[in-house]
């Protein structure tokens, strides 16, 4: 069994260019969405139904259900975020970006929804070849605690990629006994 200190040391060895968790920020505790709207409960229920539809690859019906959830409560950032994911599954990145922008506008700055929306938007930007926008959104998600975003930040950093490659080569040589 490893301690949190052991994991922190290993993380620093394996990801030397990433900040340590004791860099003054500590662990990020994300808030849940706080939506003050009479339709929020029904919207959340419709959203759960839409997620089930999407998980069964019934994406078109899922998008319709997410849209219904948004109509019931247009202030629900999670519904926009989840519909964006469905749009991505449908290969509609522009619609996904519109929903992600709206989700981020509505979400609190330190919410799980904001973190997820930043990661999704960064992924779209990266696929579109806009590494600057991708880097900015991955950085925002990394600050909110996304380990995936942290890995992507390293991947987008050419110096980190070079360091990781050299480190992998050193470990491989040590393992095989080559000098």
Swiss-Prot record:
Keywords: Repeat, TPR repeat. InterPro entries: TPR-like_helical_dom_sf, TPR_rpt, TTC36. One of its GO terms (biological process) is tyrosine metabolic process. Pfam families: TPR_17, TPR_8. TPR repeats lie at residues 43-76, 77-110, 115-148. Belongs to the TTC36 family. This is Tetratricopeptide repeat protein 36. It comes from Caenorhabditis briggsae.
